């Protein structure tokens, strides 16, 4: 029996010595390699488990002592069971299990051998985490090294943020522990380690072994050193965001420690926004962010007005024009309640002038607030009775210049149709539109005159609009020469003087017409000549027209260089007056020299200039001239 015992002791000594030598070799070789290159993470398929590593060591150093003897069975300590249970629990929580590094395998093999030695020396079952005296003296790294033996290496995932704190085994004291002493152990809650001031951030901290855990990780029982022995916890911090510098707390420095919530009770600490995001695929039960999305955090803000003008960039040109017209504020129409759920205020929104209902944000979709258009209709849109009523109500209630202009344009375009001319009158829209000419804004006045001009094509509407003729004439004379208000106002008066019913209202304005005729541009001349032609066809207005003193420049309308349109209307006026002079006998004594009567007689200046137009290049003018010359 003594020989058998001696052989067993020899075998155990050989195994222990070989394991210690192998650990020293790997440790020193690993330190040399860390200075040269970064360690690459190993996946689960490449890296072997602790049991496989121990099996490899046993297979390499087994001594055949005969058929009656078998290699000594390693003693598995209770702490090792707990550590493996926790490692398996972390594997089930994480989406990708962390592969133990080569150093983990070596540490576990060394721990297995230490367990055998502890069995013979009388060390307790929790002695696995404490390195023996011989190994501690042989393997004594400096206290500033952050590599902790027995911890797994965190997987390096490109672009994925890492958890800053992970429960792992704390480094035991580097002091030599006398053999045969039982080291008391106690479970300590993981602490949140913060960097102390002046601590350098090593670039090789990613190589420091550490188990990367999900946001909520279970506590790991950490063996503690006896009282009086310094046991710094080498906690490595992983960056919370990609591209951040990696920092580590070096043991031996004065680093401030904050107790994690629940540390005094042993509760599982929950990661907050300060600890960084969970690595992609870090847990089977995916941790959701605060705003409900998966993975990356999503913005919860609705897009704001980037330009400060009351609309977003995607609202279209109409909104931009609306805001610019009112000093940088967008106009939203106040719409009356529609009857019987009628659409027209929100359902006419085009895709080009509005934001889409939802926008793509990562993997989720969030609603985007819809913004109403400044005006509910297109200005060239043909509306029905109910929509016309809404536009009239909007025009009457709104004090916004932009809304008033767009509403007047919409009504003006709809008034081109005879059916809508009657509809607007029946809806009481004539006074609403006509009152807009009292506005001081020339743009609003112009749009109102355009609508009145189109509405005046209806004879019944003329009876309602004739009360505004003198007001329009006053605005024409007060406006700038050749302005849009003058042109549109003269067009309205042209329609109102087609019949003889309301011409007498402008009898006192004939002299003003001749003044504008001599000073105005081409459009002004054309409209005034049409009005004077209407007066000339009315016998009651003819005498007043002929007795009016006209400027000497009136005869210049019949020169050959005058525009064809002006020339044709001037020839038409002369033809109407000449025909009335031939049909009716007038007393020359009733008219003063310089009046229109003397210019239009056979011996007048106009007749001589008209004869000179017989060879005019314009065919219509030439035909008109030939017709008049035959009457002379």
Swiss-Prot record:
Its main location: mitochondrion. Keywords: Membrane, Mitochondrion, Mitochondrion outer membrane, Repeat, Signal-anchor, Transmembrane, Transmembrane helix. ARM repeats lie at residues 376-416, 418-457, 498-537. Expressed at high levels ovary, heart, testis, prostate, brain, spleen and colon. Expressed at very low levels in liver and thymus. Not expressed in peripheral blood leukocytes. Not expressed in pancreas and ovarian carcinomas. It is found in: Mitochondrion; Mitochondrion outer membrane. InterPro entries: ARM-like, ARM-rpt_dom, ARM-type_fold, Armadillo, Armcx_regulator. Residues 336-356 have a biased composition (Acidic residues). May regulate the dynamics and distribution of mitochondria in neural cells. This is Armadillo repeat-containing X-linked protein 2. It comes from Homo sapiens (Human). The lineage of its organism: Eukaryota, Metazoa, Chordata, Craniata, Vertebrata. The gene is ARMCX2.
């Amino acid at each position: 029996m003594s020989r058998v015992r001696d052989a067993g002791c020899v075998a155990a000594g050989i195994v222990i010595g070989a394991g210690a030598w192998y650990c020293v070799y790997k440790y020193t070789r690993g330190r040399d390699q860390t200075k040269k290159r970064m360690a690459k993470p190993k996946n689960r398929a490449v890296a072997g488990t602790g049991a496989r590593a121990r099996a490899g060591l046993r297979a390499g150093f087994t001594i055949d002592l005969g058929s009656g003897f078998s290699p000594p069975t390693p003693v598995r300590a209770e702490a090792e069971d707990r550590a493996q249970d926790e490692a398996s629990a972390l594997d089930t929580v994480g989406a990708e299990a962390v592969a133990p590094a080569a150093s983990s395998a070596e540490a576990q093999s060394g721990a297995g051998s230490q367990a055998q030695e502890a069995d013979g020396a009388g060390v307790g079952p929790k002695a696995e985490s404490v390195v023996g005296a011989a190994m501690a003296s042989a393997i004594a790294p400096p206290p500033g090294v952050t590599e902790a033996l027995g911890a797994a290496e965190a997987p390096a995932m490109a672009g994925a943020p890492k958890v800053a704190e992970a429960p792992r085994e704390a480094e035991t004291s580097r002091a030599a522990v006398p053999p045969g002493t039982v080291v008391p152990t106690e479970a300590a809650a993981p602490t949140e380690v913060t960097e102390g001031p002046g601590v350098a951030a090593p670039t090789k901290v990613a190589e420091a072994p550490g188990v990367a855990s999900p946001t909520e990780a279970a506590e790991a029982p950490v063996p503690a050193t006896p009282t009086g022995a310094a046991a710094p916890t080498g906690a490595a911090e992983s960056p919370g965001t990609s591209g951040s510098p990696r920092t580590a707390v070096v043991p031996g420095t004065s680093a401030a420690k904050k107790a994690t919530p629940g540390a005094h009770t042993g509760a599982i600490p929950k990661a907050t926004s300060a600890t960084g995001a969970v690595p992609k695929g870090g847990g089977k039960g995916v941790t959701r962010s605060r705003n409900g999305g998966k993975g990356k955090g999503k913005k919860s803000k609705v897009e704001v007005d980037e330009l400060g003008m009351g609309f977003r960039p995607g609202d279209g040109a109409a909104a931009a024009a609306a805001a610019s017209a009112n000093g940088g504020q967008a106009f939203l129409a106040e719409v009356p309640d529609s009857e019987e759920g009628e659409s027209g205020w929100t359902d006419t929104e085009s895709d080009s002038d509005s934001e889409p209902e939802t926008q793509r944000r990562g993997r989720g979709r969030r609603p985007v607030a819809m913004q109403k258009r400044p005006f509910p209709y297109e200005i060239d849109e043909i509306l029905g009775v109910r929509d016309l009523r809404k536009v009239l109500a909007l025009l009457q209630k709104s004090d916004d210049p932009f809304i008033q202009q767009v509403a007047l344009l919409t009504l003006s375009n709809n008034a081109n149709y005879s059916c809508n001319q009657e509809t607007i009158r029946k809806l009481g829209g004539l006074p609403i539109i006509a009152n807009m000419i009292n506005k001081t804004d020339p743009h609003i006045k112009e749009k109102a005159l355009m609508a009145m001009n189109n509405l005046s094509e209806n004879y019944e509407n003329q009876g309602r609009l004739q009360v505004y003729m003198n007001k329009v004439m006053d605005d024409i004379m007060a406006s700038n020469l050749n302005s849009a208000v003058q042109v549109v106002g003269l067009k309205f008066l042209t329609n109102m003087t087609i019949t003889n019913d309301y011409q007498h209202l402008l009898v006192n304005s004939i002299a003003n017409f001749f003044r504008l005729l001599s000073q105005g541009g081409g459009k002004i001349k054309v409209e005034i000549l049409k009005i004077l032609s209407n007066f000339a066809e009315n016998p009651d207005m003819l005498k007043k027209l002929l007795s009016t003193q006209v400027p000497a420049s009136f005869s210049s309308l019949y020169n050959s260089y005058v525009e064809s349109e002006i020339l044709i209307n001037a020839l038409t006026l002369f033809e109407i007056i000449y025909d009335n002079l031939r049909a009716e006998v007038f007393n020359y004594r009733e008219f003063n020299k310089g009046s229109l009567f003397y210019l239009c007689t056979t011996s007048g200046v106009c007749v001589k200039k008209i004869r000179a137009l017989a060879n005019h290049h314009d065919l219509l003018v030439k035909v008109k001239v030939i017709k008049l010359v035959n009457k002379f």
